[in-house]
Amino acid sequence: MFARNVTIHLKSNMLSEYGHVFESQILPLLRKQTGFKDEISFASSNGVDVTAISLWDTKRDAETYNTNTYPEVVKICSKVVDGTPKVQTYEVFNSTFHKISAPVPVHA
């Protein structure tokens, strides 16, 4: 499993609008993507910093989304986002929710 961690800085007083845009426009796009598994988003107490983590079956699925659909997502969010979102990618090491764990290396 693979994860995309997107850090977003919102314009002032736009958290509620971001939530609406995410639910009505972005989530439907994500659900259509091959390999998409889950999305979890966090908002800071200041209401302008958001972290969105999406989980994907494979790195290739996440990269395909990043190339083909993510530019559209950035455009959709442009009215509520201040600056350019920062994207980091990771291999999922462990998830109790998805019952995933990294293989334990065998020592000879």
Report residues per predicted region.
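Short S/T/G/P-rich N-terminal loop/turn motif that feeds into the first structured element of a domain
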Residues: 1-51, 55-71, 78-108
